[in-house]
From Swiss-Prot:
Molecular function GO terms recorded: pyrophosphatase activity
Region (Disordered): 184-235
The name this protein goes by in its record: RNA pyrophosphohydrolase
Gene: rppH
Keywords for the protein's UniProt record, in alphabetical order: Hydrolase
Residue window of motif Nudix box: 38-59
HAMAP family: Nudix_RppH
Domain of life: Bacteria
Residue ranges constituting the Nudix hydrolase domain according to the UniProt record: 6-149
């Protein structure tokens, strides 16, 4: 189902935990990480599609989340021809998305990447809200930045670390954090960002809750370009 401009209606989901960290899923059999998303079926409204995709991709039901906000309008991205089937070229142009900001009111163990027989992700992790987007496929990064920026004012502030300087926030979102910035951060230099977005390490945080879904294992952090080794949750 395409609109007259060749864009498929779609929903995207930014899922927060109680610490205002964001769910990231690793696309199955790839090194690409992304937020849950999916198409709107005929007869569905965006909210119905969001709850369906939430269950299909991460195994959650409406009672597991609270809807905090949604984007005011469609956000669009174009898909390069090399990612489009030959028979769809010339017709399909990309996706237009309504983004939802949700907060998990359940537990980590409620997440289930195998809720259907066609899983989208094979690993997942919690990251801080503002992190470099280098692990996202390039043509989606602009939409991610727009969605995160528009919905950021609805994020609960109790655990939310936010740098209000637009030039710093945009640089950080676009993955402009260099190794020298990381080294400065690790040395405690004022004004530096959390390393790799402050990705939590369940292995090193004293007293941290250790909640993994059934069958979960650890693998190295995919963001090896940042020199950070935090565990990830894999199913």
């Amino acid at each position: 189902m395409l609109d007259r401009d060749g864009f498929r209606p779609n929903v995207g989901i930014i899922l927060l935990n109680q610490r205002s960290q964001v769910f990231w899923g690793k696309r199955i059999r790839t090194h690409s990480w992304q937020f849950p998303q999916g198409g709107i079926d005929r007869g569905e409204n965006p909210e119905q599609a969001m709850f369906r995709e939430l269950h299909e991709e991460v195994g959650l039901h409406p009672q597991h989340v609270q809807v905090l906000a949604r984007t005011r309008d469609w956000l669009r991205y174009e898909v390069p021809d090399r990612f489009i089937r030959r028979d769809a070229r010339g017709h399909y142009k990309g996706q237009k998305q309504i983004w939802f900001l949700l907060q998990l009111v359940g537990h980590d163990w409620d997440l289930n990447l195998r809720a259907t027989n066609h899983p989208e992700f094979d690993a997942w992790r919690w990251n801080d809200y503002w992190v470099p987007l280098d692990v996202v496929v390039e043509f989606k990064r602009g939409v991610y930045e727009m969605a995160l920026t528009e919905l950021s004012r609805f994020v609960p502030r109790c655990e939310f670390r936010f740098d209000a300087r637009p030039e710093q926030r945009n640089r950080y979102l676009r993955g402009g954090l260099h190794q020298r910035d990381l080294l400065a951060n690790q040395s405690g230099e004022p004004g530096s960002f959390p390393a790799a977005g402050g990705i939590p390490s369940y292995a090193t945080r004293p007293g941290a809750p250790f909640e993994l879904p059934p069958g979960a294992t650890f693998e190295p952090d995919p963001q090896t370009s940042f020199g950070v080794n935090a565990p990830t949750k894999k199913t």
